[in-house]
């Protein structure tokens, strides 16, 4: 895809198209995380409450949460396949956005048919949009352009600006004024994102187009020929790295499920005489990403300048270990609850801080890694597989949350912490062998950094 990029208008050292995708994804994540922030709380709220919910048990709510968040991301596989085979990423993102606006809007209707229909449309919409917009970000950069990782970090900050705002705004509206008002507000956010995406099409002229109609002969040939030995090896590495992804998200997504309920039911949320809404704690992750995103990216860039290990696989392993360490704070919170009958808010804050640093080391890095290693003909499909692995991690999170009803939070939090750290150290033992199979996919970045500095695309305006 990136080979077709000829001339791009730039802003702050990156293609303007990056910021179009930044705001599109920001509003998409505003709608998704806003709805996610109140979904479980809506399910478990008693029907007799002033702001009545469905009155489900914690186990039932977490089971639905697990299935929903899994299917949202598993749908990325057909979404990526449709883009590769028929539509291209650009049109797929458009159709996904339309489905999302419809899905979130229907959730505002207070009927069970609307609830399940809305969830179904959101699943289809995210499947069409999520893998393809990420692939388009990679397509904005020429092969070997060292700005690619930083571009994905900027894009990732956009995701979390949306998540931060939605957890506060949609969370507040849903908990205080009514769950369905919150769902409707999420739909308005997605509509704004869709309008912004359509308005910025002139900056996305060279990315996301269906490769079957490409004028580039090299791209046409790449779409038809079988995979080479190098491409097959790189795909193997990607699939192994996806194991890290499943484990990471299986632990991390306790945020929307078990940790969300824990904040609501077992945490002392009083602050100067005012009770902090439980859904607001989910905004901590996004807030930390906004403030720490560029710092973490700069740290890894500094390591690369110093010639220290800073490969994508190394970053992902370190991210998993850091995130796992954060769960020891939740172990402490559960221990405090068993002793005192409630736990302090600072345990949640510390846990989210470590989870965020871990996420910054693994999630945007994994997105960039896929655009480096995936064969052109399967670019969106491989991105879809990545998000499907995220979905399986989400389902795992739901199962772990359900298990807490019988095993207890202390056991679950401690088990997650220990497993993540040990699994990360185990993969670290095989890191060099796995990186050998990438056949130097990231080597050119270092060479460019040492000899040329940043590769700057043409500034001519199309």
Predicted regions and their residues:
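Intracellular loop-helix junctions on the cytosolic face of multi-pass helical membrane proteins
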Residues: 1-20, 143-146, 153, 171-274, ...
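Hydrophobic core of transmembrane alpha-helices in multi-pass small-molecule transporters
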Residues: 26, 103, 114-129, 339-361
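Conserved MFS/SLC helix-loop-helix module at the cytosolic interface between two early adjacent transmembrane helices
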Residues: 75-109
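C-terminal ends and interior cores of transmembrane alpha-helices
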Residues: 98-116, 318-340
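Central cavity-lining transmembrane alpha-helices of secondary-active solute carriers
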Residues: 62-83, 283-296
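Glycine-rich segments within core transmembrane alpha-helices of 12-TM secondary carriers
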Residues: 147-175, 182-193, 285-289, 380-397
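Short amphipathic helix-loop junctions that connect adjacent transmembrane helices
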Residues: 37-60, 255-281
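Cytoplasmic membrane-interface "Motif A"-like loop-to-helix N-cap segments
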Residues: 85-97, 302-321
């Amino acid at each position: 895809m990136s080979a077709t990029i000829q001339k791009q208008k730039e802003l702050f050292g990156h293609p303007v198209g990056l910021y179009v995708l930044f705001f599109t994804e920001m509003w998409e994540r505003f709608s998704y995380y806003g709805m996610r922030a109140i979904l479980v709380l809506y399910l478990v709220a008693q029907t007799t409450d002033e702001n009545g919910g469905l009155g489900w048990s914690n186990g039932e709510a977490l089971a639905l949460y697990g299935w929903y968040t899994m299917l949202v991301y598993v749908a990325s596989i057909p979404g990526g396949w449709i883009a590769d085979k028929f539509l291209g990423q650009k049109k797929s993102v458009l159709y996904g956005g339309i489905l999302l606006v419809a899905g979130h809007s229907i959730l505002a209707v207070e009927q069970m048919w609307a609830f399940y229909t809305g969830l179904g449309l959101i699943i289809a919409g995210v499947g069409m949009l999520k893998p393809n917009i990420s692939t388009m970000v990679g397509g904005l950069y020429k092969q070997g352009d060292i700005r690619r990782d930083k571009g994905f970090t900027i894009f990732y900050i956009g995701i979390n600006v949306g998540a931060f705002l939605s957890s506060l705004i949609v969370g507040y509206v849903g908990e205080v004024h009514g769950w369905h008002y919150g769902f409707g507000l999420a739909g308005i956010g997605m509509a704004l994102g869709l309008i912004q995406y359509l308005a910025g099409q002139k900056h996305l002229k060279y990315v996301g187009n269906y490769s079957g109609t490409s004028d580039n002969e090299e791209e046409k040939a790449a779409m038809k020929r079988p995979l080479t030995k190098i491409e097959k090896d790189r795909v193997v590495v990607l699939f192994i790295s996806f194991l890290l992804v499943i484990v990471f998200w299986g632990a991390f997504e306790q945020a929307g499920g078990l940790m969300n309920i824990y904040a609501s039911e077992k945490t002392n949320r009083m602050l100067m005489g005012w009770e902090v809404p439980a859904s607001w704690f989910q905004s901590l992750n996004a807030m930390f990403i906004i403030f720490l995103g560029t710092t973490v990216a700069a740290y890894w860039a500094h390591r690369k300048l110093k010639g220290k290990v800073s490969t994508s696989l190394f970053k992902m392993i370190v991210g998993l270990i850091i995130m796992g360490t954060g769960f020891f704070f939740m172990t402490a919170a559960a221990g405090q609850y068993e002793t005192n009958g409630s736990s302090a808010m600072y345990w949640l804050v510390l846990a989210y801080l470590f989870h965020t640093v871990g996420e910054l080391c693994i999630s945007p890095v994994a997105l960039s890694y896929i655009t480096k290693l995936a064969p052109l003909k399967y670019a969106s499909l491989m991105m879809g597989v990545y998000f499907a692995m995220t979905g399986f991690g989400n389902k795992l999170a739901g199962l772990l949350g359900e298990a807490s009803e019988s095993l207890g939070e202390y056991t679950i939090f401690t088990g997650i912490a220990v497993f993540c750290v040990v699994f990360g150290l185990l993969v670290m033992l095989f890191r060099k062998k796995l990186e050998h199979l990438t056949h130097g996919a990231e080597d050119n970045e270092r060479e460019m950094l040492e000899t040329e500095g940043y590769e700057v695309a043409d500034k001519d305006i199309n």
